[in-house]
Amino acid sequence: MQESRRHFLAASAFALPALSTAIQAQSTPSRRPKLKITDIRTAEIRGHGYQVHVRIYTDQGIYGHGEATDSAQGAVPLIQGFRRFLIGQDPLNIEAIWERIRTGGIFAGAQGGQYVTALTGIEIALWDLAGKALGLPIYQLMGGKVRDKIRVYCDSANHHPDDPQAKAKLKEIETMGFTALKFDIDEANDAARFDRMNWTASNGEIDRMVKEVAFVRESVSKKVDVAVDMHGRYDATTGKRVAIELEPFRLMWLEEPVPAENVDVMRDIRQATKTPICCGENLFLRHGFREVLEKRAVDIIMPDIQKCGGLLEARKIADMAHVYNIPFAPHCVVSPVGYMASCHVCAAVPNFMVLEWHWISRLKLWKEFVKEGEIIEKGFVTVPDRPGIGVEMNEEAAKTAQVPNTSWFRPGV
C-alpha cells in the first residue's frame, strides 16, 4: 500500500507540470492580427446589370473585396459617406460595424434600397478581409459547410417557340451540365396586351405564356428542372390564373407573379395553386422577409445576397426560413467575385436549394473575370478552401466592363 502511494506521488510530480502547461495554453487568449481600416475604394462595372465592387484596406496591407448589385447605381456616394463608420475600426468586428451603419441611417433610408445595397458591398468586403486575416474560408467563419458543391441553375431570359435558335440554346444549357434553368414569361410588348399600364393579362397573353412554358419543357429532358419568372408585373387575378394554368408542367417555381410588397396577395396565389411560388429578390434585410415567412406566402425564398444586407444577413434570413421548412434559393446576377461569396453562404445553410447564374450571354467575361478562371463545372460550384472568398479579380479583364467616367479603386481622401 505504501509502495503504491509512493508510485502515485512520483507519477503526479511528473504529470502536474505538463497539466499546468496545458491549462495555461488553454487559458491564453487567442492571438489574432490587430488590424485597422485605412481606406475604402470602389469600382463600377456593367456585367449582367450594374455592380459596385468595394475594397476595404487595412494598415497591415490586407484588403477585402465585396460586391453589390441592382440598386447599386447611386450607391458609391453612400459607400464613401460610410467612411466615418469605418476608418480606424477593427475590420473583424463585422457585426458592430454593420449595425452602426444600419442604425446610423434610420432616417436616411436604411430600411432598404440603395442604402442597404451600399451596406451589403461593405459587409461582404469585411468578410473577405476577415477570412484572409484569419487564414480561413468564409464558410468556416459561418459555422462550417454542410455541402462541398453548390447546385446552379442557368437563367436564360426568353425562349420563344418561333425563334429557330431557341431549342438549340436550351439544349446547349443542358449539355453544359445544368440540371435546372429559368426563363422569363413577362413581356411588355406582347401583341395581345391592350394597355401597358393595366397589369391584368389578356387571354392571348396567358396563352402565349403557357405556349412558351410547354416549348421549354419539351425542349429539355425531364431531369432538368424549369422555373419561370414574371418579375412582379401582373395583378392578383393574372397571377392566380397563370399559376393554375402552369400546374401540369410541375415547375420548380413561379417567381413573383405579383409585386412582392403585397404579402396577402402572394399568399392567396400560393394557397390557390399547386405550382410553387417564389419571391425575395426585391426584399431587404430580415425584416423584409418576416411577414412573408410568418404568413407562409411563398414556398421558396430567394434573397439577393448582394443587396439584401450581406452574407451574415442572408444566413440569418435562411435560418428564419428553415424554421418554416422553406428552402433558400438566392437570386444572383453578379460577377464571379460576388457569386463565390454567395456560394459560401449556400455551403453553410442546411436549407439551400439552388443558386441562380445569369451570365450565359457574357461567357468570355465570366470566365476571365477572376484569376482562378471558370468556377462553374457541369452545373455546380465547388466551394474553395482558400482564405476569404477564395477568388481574386482579374483587373485586366474586369476593366473591360468598367462603367465609363467612373473611378477604378481610387484612394479615398
Q: Which stretches of residues belong to each language-model region?
A:
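Extended hydrophobic packing segments that form well-structured cores
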Residues: 389-413
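Shared catalytic-loop signature of beta/alpha-barrel
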Residues: 76-77, 84, 89, 96, ...
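Glycine-rich, aromatic-flanked loop segments that form ligand/cofactor-binding clefts
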Residues: 123-159
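Metal-dependent enolase-superfamily TIM-barrel catalytic cores that perform enediolate-based chemistry
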Residues: 149-272
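Conserved, mostly hydrophobic/aromatic
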Residues: 37, 61, 122, 135, ...
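C-terminal segment of N-terminal export signals and the immediately downstream linker at the start
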Residues: 19-48, 54-56
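Metal- or metallocofactor-binding catalytic centers and their adjacent structured scaffolds
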Residues: 62-134
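N-terminal secretory signal peptides and thylakoid transit peptides that target proteins
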Residues: 1-16
